[in-house]
């Protein structure tokens, strides 16, 4: 099984250096014909590029479902030194300072950017270029990146976890909306109810949402945001408040991650730095910390989620 291969640990970019050849960096919109090159670039750091890699694998480089545009930055020898998705959200892998500056300039031209998400040091550097005059942040969320590379021990009893069906949509939507509001301060059911429901529906149709339903209640939910041979990235993990501390969460997540590790090398999640009990919950299942991530929410009431 792939899950039995050696654990891979990516080293964070601790210093972003200028281009070795002092020729102007060139940034262009990426097209379908660039897809193989871009995926090769992103999979050099698969853990940190899970979101962008997943979107490209699911939708291609050019798709409305990406909710933005992919750009590539090249050095004087025409080699990729950075890839970014800029639109509703900003996601970046910049291997040099020039690329980071180029992406910040581009992002300034998108007035409806809602969030910026990435490794803590990269986000800090990007922000200096993006907001040189000290623009305020609507909200900053710091999270711990956790990674699981070995299947959790099998519990004594398993949960009836299953893929969600379309008839579960009415249960999934309000729960997911509540989680989004708690993190961003934006209620997606107020600012973009149709689009939000469509995205929840699409995840179900693509077999990416897992649920446990008992007594007509949604007990557990998790969404597969990105699925690749290197890493599966999960979001939207929650347990109904009335069923917490009853092992529902650990049983469901253990069952889900064992299944996922049958076709991927690792599973990753982001957990709010302030939620220590949640971090301990994941660590008890075998997740280990791989660094800090920052998400800067740029707009609140007028944001499109």
For the regions a protein language model found, what residue spans apply to each?
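Conserved active-site alpha-helix within GNAT-family acetyltransferase domains
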Residues: 121-139, 250, 273-291
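Conserved GNAT acetyl-CoA-binding A-motif
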Residues: 111-119, 231, 260-271
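Acyl-donor-binding surface of acyltransferase catalytic domains
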Residues: 1-17, 75-81, 85-159, 296-297
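A mid-sequence, solvent-exposed acidic-amphipathic segment
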Residues: 157-227
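Conserved acetyl-CoA-binding loop-helix of GNAT-fold acetyltransferases
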Residues: 97-106, 239-241, 245-261, 279-280, ...
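Conserved beta-strand-loop-alpha-helix junction that forms the acyl-donor binding cleft
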Residues: 117-123, 269-280, 296-304
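Conserved donor-binding loop and adjoining core beta-sheet/short helix segment
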Residues: 21-30, 40-49, 53-111, 115, ...
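Short amphipathic alpha-helix that is part of the acyltransferase structural core
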Residues: 4-52, 151-189, 305
């Amino acid at each position: 099984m792939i899950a039995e291969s050696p654990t891979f640990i990516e080293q964070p970019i601790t210093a972003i250096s200028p281009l070795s050849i002092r020729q102007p960096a060139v940034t262009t919109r990426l097209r379908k014909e660039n897809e193989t090159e871009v995926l090769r670039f992103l999979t050099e750091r698969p853990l940190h590029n899970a979101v962008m890699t997943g979107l490209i694998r699911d939708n291609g480089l050019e798709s409305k479902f990406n909710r933005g545009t992919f750009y590539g930055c090249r050095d004087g020898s025409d080699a990729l030194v950075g890839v970014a998705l800029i639109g509703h959200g900003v996601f970046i892998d910049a291997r040099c300072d020039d690329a980071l500056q180029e992406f910040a300039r581009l992002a300034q031209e998108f007035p409806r950017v809602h969030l910026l998400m990435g490794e803590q040091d990269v986000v800090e550097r990007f922000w200096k270029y993006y907001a040189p005059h000290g623009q305020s942040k609507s909200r900053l969320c710091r999270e711990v990146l956790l990674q699981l590379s070995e299947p959790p021990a099998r519990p004594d009893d398993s949960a009836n976890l299953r893929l969600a069906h379309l008839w579960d949509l009415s249960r999934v939507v309000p729960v997911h909306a509540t989680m989004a509001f708690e993190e961003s301060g934006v209620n997606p059911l107020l600012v973009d109810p149709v689009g939000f429901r469509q995205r929840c529906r699409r995840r179900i149709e693509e077999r990416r949402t897992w649920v446990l339903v008992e007594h007509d209640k949604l007990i557990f939910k998790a969404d597969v945001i990105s699925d690749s041979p290197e890493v599966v990235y999960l979001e939207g993990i929650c347990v109904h408040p009335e069923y917490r501390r009853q092992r529902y969460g650990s049983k469901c997540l253990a069952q889900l991650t064992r299944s996922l590790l049958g076709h991927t090398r690792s599973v990753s999640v982001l957990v709010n730095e302030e939620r220590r009990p949640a971090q301990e919950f994941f660590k008890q299942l075998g997740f280990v910390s791989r660094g800090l991530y920052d998400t800067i929410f740029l707009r609140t009431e007028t944001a499109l989620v």
